[in-house]
A protein has these predicted regions:
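...with weaker cross-activation on analogous glycine-rich loops/strands in unrelated enzymes
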Residues: 27-29, 74-133, 139
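Active-site nucleophile-His-acid catalytic modules used for acyl/amide transfer and hydrolysis
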Residues: 41-58, 76-78
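Active-site nucleophilic cysteine motif
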Residues: 56-69
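Bacterial Sec signal peptide processing site at the extreme N-terminus
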Residues: 11-36
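Glycine- and charge-enriched low-complexity intrinsically disordered segments
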Residues: 138-152
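Second-shell loop/turn segments in exported
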Residues: 24-28, 48-56, 104
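Positively charged n-region of N-terminal signal peptides that target proteins for export
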Residues: 1-5
Length: 152
């Protein structure tokens, strides 16, 4: 009897000290995507803005978004207008890391700008002043010019 009590005690001790794995935990894909986008943004921080460009040597806003998302294995059209015209429409309140955000910044049909939403109300974009910058989506400048978002 003493031997059985000892074995039962050992079993309870071992099971009580066993490793518990939370099977409901899944690392956030968006967190990983955001980290990757930050690395990409850093690589493009000195890229001059040149209309029609698509490389780190020179690019425009949609060339940057196309190249950045391609590094995440997401294929999108080349121009701001075609990027806005495709993808799935997303409301501002439902933005997720990697969504494209669009702005009316100039005159005419091509006076648009595009960036990539990060999180916490921030997005990255290739600035016309040169280099990729992270800025607040709800700053007075960008908030007044916001026209929509797309998810790919």
């Amino acid at each position: 009897m003493r031997h059985i009590f000892f074995i039962i005690t050992i079993i309870f001790f071992i099971s009580g000290c066993s490793f518990y794995q939370n099977l409901n935990y899944r690392p956030s894909y968006n967190t990983n995507k955001e980290a990757r986008l930050k690395v990409i943004a850093n690589e493009w921080k000195k890229t001059p803005y040149v209309l029609g460009g698509t490389s780190k040597k020179r690019a425009d806003c949609s060339g940057f978004t196309q190249s950045a998302l391609a590094q995440l294995n997401i294929r999108i059209p080349r121009t701001t207008k075609t990027q806005l015209g495709s993808g799935r429409k997303v409301s501002k309140s439902k933005l997720q890391t990697g969504d494209l955000v669009f702005f009316k910044t100039g005159r005419g049909p091509n006076g648009m700008h595009v960036g990539i939403y990060m999180s916490k109300g921030k997005f990255i974009h290739l600035s016309t002043k040169g280099g990729v910058k992270e800025v607040e989506l709800n700053s007075s400048y960008w908030k007044a010019r916001y026209i929509g978002a797309r998810r790919y």
